[in-house]
Amino acid sequence: MGEYVKVGNLQVAKLFYEFMNDEVLPGSEVNKEKFWKDFETLIADLTPKNKALLARRDELQAKINEWHKEHRGNFDMEKYKAFLTDIGYLEPEVDDFEITTEGVDEEIAVQAGPQLVVPLTNARYALNAANARWGSLYDALYGTDAISEEDGAERGDSYNPVRGAKVIAYAREFLDQAVPLKEYSHKDAVQYAVVDGKLVVSVEGGSTTTLKEEEKFIGFQGNPENPTAILLKNNGLHIEIQIDRNHPVGKTDKAGVKDIYLEAAVTTIMDGEDSVAAVDAEDKVLVYRNLLGLVKGDLTSTFTKGGKTITRALNPDRVYRTADGKEITLPGRSLMFVRNVGHLMTNNTILDANGEEVYEGIMDAVVTSLIMKHSLLGNTRYLNSRKGSFYIVKPKMHGSEEVAFANELFDRVEDMLGLKRNTIKIGVMDEERRTTLNLKNCIYQVRDRIIFINTGFLDRTGDEIHTSMEAGPMIRKNDMKTSVWLQAYEKSNVTIGLAAGFQGRAQIGKGMWAMPDMMAEMLKQKGGQLKAGANTAWVPSPTAATLHALHYHQVNVAEVQNELRKERKDYRDEILQIPVAVNPQWTPEEIQEELDNNCQGILGYVVRWIDQGIGCSKVPDINNIGLMEDRATLRISSQHIANWLHHGICTKEQVLETLKRMAKVVDEQNAGDPNYRPMAPDYDNSVAFQAACDLIFKGYEQPNGYTEPILHRRRLEAKAKYAAVQQ
């Protein structure tokens, strides 16, 4: 642990104290002395409440464990529901209401589109994500498996015109679907021009045509008769046809089209939670400093690619002229949210009056809000919100009393920083069972500031397993995806969100496509999330955002939501169906296959987290398919093995043998990484391997099955160990 400064009754890490005083507070219109005094008061007031909420989690879990032990073999759903109601796990539902959130940006309230999630510890990734508001469709198609490599269309080191032709044909087909012409096809176009306020398209043979729906033409760049860009709009998202007859692609195109740019990631979650490994003041300052750079617009990242030095910075806005000569400006960057941590963890960046670590969620709320305040005061190169709001995603809350606590925290932060009430908007992750079952009540507690609810398979299943740990052995992990409770959870989230008036006001989000290399498959499947009522869904990369944007042109989300709003089904009984395997008949091979898969996934993620502080990366699975993993993958996998161990489906010796065997596989998969520390054969001396063992063998007693306590402890151990070796 580094040096501390005594500030009132707080002890504040010197590194963090200087960062706040020198970089964050100046220009914030918040007095330095008052800030630290108010911060101390806030910590003193809210710490006991935070502790009480965590104690309540443990109390409920203990009662549920006992109930399952007493009723093993004679489970009765009605008795189970009555029990959950008696202990306050199932809350009495509030009356119908609609949210009243005001000052919400169009990217949330009006536009349906992809959402990126990116670790704040990596400046380059964060900048790429912020800039993924617009993406090249040609690049996204050419560089991925979205276009097959059959018939001579291979991706190679140099440009392949056969592949290029397939890309162009695909893109023209997309234009014909999204912005069709009255007659002919975009494939026939030889020129795009603006004549008498309309987009006029000349085709081969001398004929001209216009758009079938002329209102989809928004503007252009360049001269009307020879524009360099045509701006169109469909289902609320923009499309930019770029024209340059001197460009290598443009000069081979009849109409001179060099590319088609799509409005893609309309929102991005800058993440300080599950995709980062931030365990001390040094890490937290990196998270906060990168956020400050993004908000102020001065963050840059310099790196070498192909022998060239490249500097990334935020993209400027895009300016066009409308048909009647007016200028319009569109944002060049994604609207940024920031994800804080949940209520569980503490961090040694600040020690309170009792010398105890402060709750990280309280610290995050104060610091990220103060950073975002700069965008309201105009201390920034670019505007993030045009409505004077900022957006904090709050994860891993259990039930409405925890959401009410987040609301109280945000109220207090607004008062402390001189912000109008409900300036801080909240996104509530629906990823814990008690929140799912009481979602309407959770939303009610933040009805004046909520802008987002979201489902996620991994964390939610982790909590499902842990909550019902004593109910019996769980079904296999892959079978969870088609289980009754999970389908009901996904539908219930949409139904409750729409009934609470989210349409036109807030986002209803769906989970991550975790396979960034499998874009053809994503194009086939991910549109289903929009048909299920989502108006945003998570993607793992800017390229994936561009391709996922195609789904929003194919599916009119507003129409889907209009239909779904008519449904008012209560899914609670289905959500309560515990995914326990009834008389499992798994063969030894099937059990081993499940263990191999889970152990390999745990080790592949943990080894980078513990040894290198990487909280999100493309981790090869057991079949060498790259999966974009964050901490949620650990929770489901470690809890699944812990459950099977607890019920005797496998033995500790078998799991340990599997871990050791899989460690060798993971070592091999990472052989090309010069910073990698192998786990085999000295398993006892590998902090990462020991962390993986802890996650499984101590999984039963982890609070709600969370992985953070073990990860943080082991990462701090690894940092100290490797620092000592370097000295």
Swiss-Prot record:
Mg(2+) binds at E431, D459. InterPro entries: Malate_synth_C_sf, Malate_synth_sf, Malate_synthase_TIM, Malate_synthG, MS_C, MS_N, MS_N_TIM-barrel_dom, MSG_insertion. It comes from the Bacteria. GO terms for molecular function: magnesium ion binding; malate synthase activity. GO terms for cellular component: cytosol. Pathway: Carbohydrate metabolism; glyoxylate cycle; (S)-malate from isocitrate: step 2/2. GO terms for biological process: glyoxylate catabolic process; glyoxylate cycle; tricarboxylic acid cycle. The keyword Cytoplasm applies. It is found in: Cytoplasm. The modification Cysteine sulfenic acid (-SOH) is found at C616. It is an enzyme of class 2 (transferase). Its main location: cytoplasm. Glyoxylate binds at R339, E431, G456, F457, L458, D459. Its cofactor is Mg(2+). Belongs to the malate synthase family. GlcB subfamily. Involved in the glycolate utilization. Catalyzes the condensation and subsequent hydrolysis of acetyl-coenzyme A (acetyl-CoA) and glyoxylate to form malate and CoA. PANTHER family: MALATE SYNTHASE G. This is Malate synthase G. The gene is glcB.
